[in-house]
């Protein structure tokens, strides 16, 4: 496996954005945060705030993950301050999951983050996403906050 991170072009970004809005909306519904009828519009607003200039939004680095010429996923790293980064998205496309692409991508993004001068990287993972939580813990990411809620 030879993982390479290539800056997204506009076509790849549009494909990612369509996927990401739906995925984020679905995850918010699963978590009990949003209702079905409002989820897509709320997710769209969030992405418009985070990426007002699309893939050209300053301090945001959106990459297509490739294994050779094959597209296997995407990762989005935002530079929050001069020293802190935040991964807003890591998605390995269906059919490519469970093959080590997530782990290798995280290792590659850490190399790039250091080149950008970052000293730390944060990320968010939904509590129900045990596969992602396990991966991040194995890579040395530590929980900093835990939000808990009870539905009545």
Positions of PLM-derived features:
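Active-site acidic-Proline motif in GNAT/NAT acetyltransferases
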Residues: 93-95, 99, 127-128
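Acetyl-CoA-dependent GNAT
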Residues: 7-88, 93-95, 112, 146-152
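Conserved active-site alpha-helix within GNAT-family acetyltransferase domains
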Residues: 103, 127-145, 150
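Conserved GNAT acetyl-CoA-binding A-motif
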Residues: 106, 114-124
């Amino acid at each position: 496996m030879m993982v390479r991170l290539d800056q997204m072009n506009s076509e790849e970004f549009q494909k990612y954005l369509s996927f990401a809005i739906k995925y984020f909306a679905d995850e918010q519904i699963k978590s009990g945060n949003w209702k079905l009828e409002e989820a897509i519009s709320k997710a769209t607003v969030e992405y418009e705030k985070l990426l007002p200039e699309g893939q050209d939004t300053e301090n945001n680095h959106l990459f297509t993950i490739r294994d050779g010429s094959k597209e296997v996923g995407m990762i989005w790293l935002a530079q929050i301050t001069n020293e802190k980064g935040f991964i807003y998205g890591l998605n390995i496309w269906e059919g490519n999951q469970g093959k080590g692409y997530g782990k290798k991508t995280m290792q590659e993004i850490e190399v790039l983050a250091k080149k950008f001068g970052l000293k730390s990287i944060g990320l968010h993972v939904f509590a129900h996403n045990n596969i992602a939580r396990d991966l991040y813990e194995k890579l040395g990411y530590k929980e900093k906050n835990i939000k808990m809620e009870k539905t009545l």
